């Protein structure tokens, strides 16, 4: 299965440079609503089977146009909710830069635990477990490779992508997840493949749709690379 990790559109908190965290009622701003509408066009023609989202309002608003267009009822999963930033929640980013913990978040995020909140290592653990669980469930339900969307938050996406890359959490700040961006991971029996990171372009198509199989055709023909293996030298498609 292939998951499209969709970050919510730009929010009213993004606009004023505060850390929204799990604050109730943080909605999309005007640009964010435009981004949500544009997601439908960006994913046109892709066989998306399911949408899973964070319980927070900005994620609900982001997937509403897509869910309506596809006739899907999004599933809410608390495990892909925003980081619980504790007492950092609602504060100006410019003020947080002055906190001693800021340097830890930047340089050793695996050790960062937000005061009154949770640690980034726990965020990665819960989010990766959720994504992999949904991926297995949907693979069984749809008997093979298909696409699904998980609408979540920037640090959550970065943590999941780091896991898929086999990168230590302490390097996850090297990954970017802009508002309304899409990062794509294909999970196989042996390993994940990271197809896109922070895609913000018009259409998301390359490498996402599996080639249709002919009835009775073997999973892998002689001379073909198994789907769970990487092509030595790079893809030839």
Indicate where each model-derived feature is located.
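Generic structural signal for well-ordered alpha-helical scaffold segments
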Residues: 37-44, 124, 128-139, 161
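Phosphate-handling substructures
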Residues: 69-129, 196-199, 208, 221, ...
């Amino acid at each position: 299965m292939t998951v499209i990790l969709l970050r919510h559109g730009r929010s009213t908190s993004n606009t004023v440079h505060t850390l929204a965290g799990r604050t109730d009622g943080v909605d999309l701003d005007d640009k964010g609503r435009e981004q949500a509408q544009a997601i439908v066009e960006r994913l046109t023609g892709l066989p998306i089977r399911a949408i899973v989202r964070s319980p927070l309002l900005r994620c609900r608003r982001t997937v509403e146009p897509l869910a309506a267009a596809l006739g899907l009822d999004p599933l809410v999963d608390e495990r892909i909710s925003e980081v619980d930033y504790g007492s950092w929640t609602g504060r100006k980013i410019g003020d947080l830069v002055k906190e001693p913990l800021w340097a830890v978040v930047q340089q050793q995020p695996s050790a960062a635990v937000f005061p009154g909140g949770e640690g980034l290592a726990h965020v990665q653990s819960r989010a990766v477990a959720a994504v992999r669980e949904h991926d297995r469930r949907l693979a069984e339900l749809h008997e093979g490779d298909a696409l699904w969307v998980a609408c979540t938050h920037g640090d959550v996406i970065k943590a999941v992508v780091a896991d898929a890359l086999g990168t230590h959490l302490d390097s996850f700040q090297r990954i970017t997840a802009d508002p309304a961006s899409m990062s794509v991971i294909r999970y196989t029996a042996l390993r994940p493949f990271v197809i896109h990171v922070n895609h913000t372009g018009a259409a998301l198509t390359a490498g996402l749709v599996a080639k249709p199989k002919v009835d009775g055709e073997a999973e892998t023909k002689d001379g073909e690379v198994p789907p769970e293996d990487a092509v030595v030298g790079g893809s030839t498609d």
